[in-house]
Amino acid sequence: MEPLKGLILSGGAGTRLRPITHTSAKQLVPVANKPVLFYGIEALVDAGVKEIGIIIAPETGDEIRAAAGDGSQFGAEITYIVQDKPAGLAHAVLTAEDFIGRSPFVMYLGDNLLRDGLRNLVATFTDHEPDTLILLTPVDDPQSYGVAELDGEKIVRLIEKPKDPPSNLALVGVYLFTSLIFDAARSLEPSWRGELEITEAIDKLIDDGRTVRSEVVRGWWKDTGQLADMLEANRLVLEELVTSIEGDVDEASKVEGRLVLGPGAKLERSVVRGPAVIGAGAHVEDAYIGPYTSIGDGVHVRRSEVENSIVLSGSVVEDLGTRMEASLLGKEVKLTRSEGMPKTLQLLVGDRSEIKLV
C-alpha cells in the first residue's frame, strides 16, 4: 500500500461553542493551552502521515492558516483546501479529491481528541488493507449518534440516530479510506439536511461488496464541540501533565500537584493545586488556581479563585469575590467586580452568550 495522506476537517461553524466561535475557529480553542486542531495534526504525524490537507471555511480559514502554517512546526507538509459551504462530510471528501489523488487517506474531524492517537489504527489499515476502516467507541446514548451494525469486525450497515440501536458503537469521526470513496460520494443525492452524508457513501461501498471494517477506540475519545466536553477533554489531558516550571514562583506562593508554568509567568502570594497549566507571561497574584485549570498566555488573575476552567490568552480575572468554576473565557475578556454600593451587575454581553449567576 502506498503512503497514506491525512485529511483534517476544520470548516465547521462551531455553533455549540458560541460566542467563542463567533470570532475564532472552534478547532483553535485550546485544551491544556494547545489548540484542539494541533492534537489531530500531531496524531497523524506520530502515525507516519506527514502529507496533510486541512479543509477550511472561508470565514475562519485565514486564522487556521496563521496558526498551523505550512506544517513544518509539526514535521508535516500542510495543504489548505477551501470548502465554500458546509455541505456534508462526503462533500468535503470530494472537495479534497485533487489533493488526495489515488492515495489511501485518513479523514479526521478536527475537533476530536484521541488519547492513544492513530498509530495502531493506521497499522491495522496498512496490514489488512480493507477498503474502509472506521473508528468506533461505546456510548451510553447510541440514539444520539451514527451507529454501526457489525458482523464481527465487519460493518454491515451504518444507521444515523437509530430509535432501536443495533449496538452501542458510535462513529467517532476518524475514517480510513481508499480512493473508492470518491465514486461512492459522487453517486449520492443530498440528504434531508441538504448535505452529502459520509455514512451513505460508506453504505454504498458495503452494498457494492467492498470490505468495511471497524476498530474500537483504545483509551479515551472526546468530541470537543460543547463546553462540557471541552472541559472534560481539558481534564483528561491535564491528568497526564508532566511538571515544568519555567516561570517565577515567589516564596509566598504554594504549588501542590503537577504544574506547567510557562516562561515569563509569575506566581505571587498564590496557591496552585494541580494539575494545571499557566501560559507564558501570565501573572497570578493573591489568587487560587484549582485543579484542571488552563490559564492562557498573558492572562492576569488577581484576588480571585479559578478552578476546572479554561481562560484564553490576554484575559483578566480580577476581584471576583467568589470562585469561578467550569467556565470558558475567550481571548482578551475582562472579568472584574467593582467596589462600592449598591451591589449591582453591570454586563456587556455579546450575541448567543451564556452567563450563569449563583
Residue ranges: model-predicted function:
Residues M1, L180, S187-V358:
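Left-handed beta-helix
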Residues M1-I8, R16-H22, V29-P30, K34-L109, ...:
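Conserved N-terminal catalytic core of the sugar/cofactor nucleotidyltransferase
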Residues G12, D111, P138, Q226:
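Active-site glycine-centered loops adjacent to acidic/histidine catalytic or metal-binding residues
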Residues G12, E59, S179-L180, A228:
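Alpha-helix/helix-capping structural signal
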Residues L28, A148-L150, S214:
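A structural signal for short hydrophobic beta-strand segments in well-ordered beta-sheet cores
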Residues V29, V174-Y175, D223:
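Residues that recognize and position ribonucleotide moieties
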Residues I81-Q83, L135, E215-V217:
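Conserved beta-strand termini and adjacent loop/short-helix elements that scaffold enzyme active sites
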Residues L114-E189:
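Conserved core of the sugar-phosphate nucleotidyltransferase
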